[in-house]
């Protein structure tokens, strides 16, 4: 009989459809070269998980979604953060596991997220999983549940 973690992964794998959002200007949120800061809540929200836990979560999302988790960026210096790009408006008003930092725009709040170009010199940021479609992002429920399973923090919906 599978353990609770395996059941969670199986349940999450059954709901891997990415969420579509504003596709008005195709990939205009992606810089042509280097990297730029983008205001969260306009094209996307983001969550960040630092260090080895972030990389484990990215690996988990890659596995759960059969290699199509949505856009994920890794940072190779400092806190070695991993950024998960989600549909705009999807991170606010939800409980996230400890260790997850949300980037969105709410009342009285402005957040900026680094976004690398798809090619060329983008150090210290690199695409773990580049965007494959302008309107596809990481699925919020799958990511929240995967983070909860990784950090051992039960979620209530």
Regions found by a protein language model. Give the residues of each.
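Histidine-centered, metal-coordinating catalytic motifs and their short helical/loop contexts
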Residues: 81
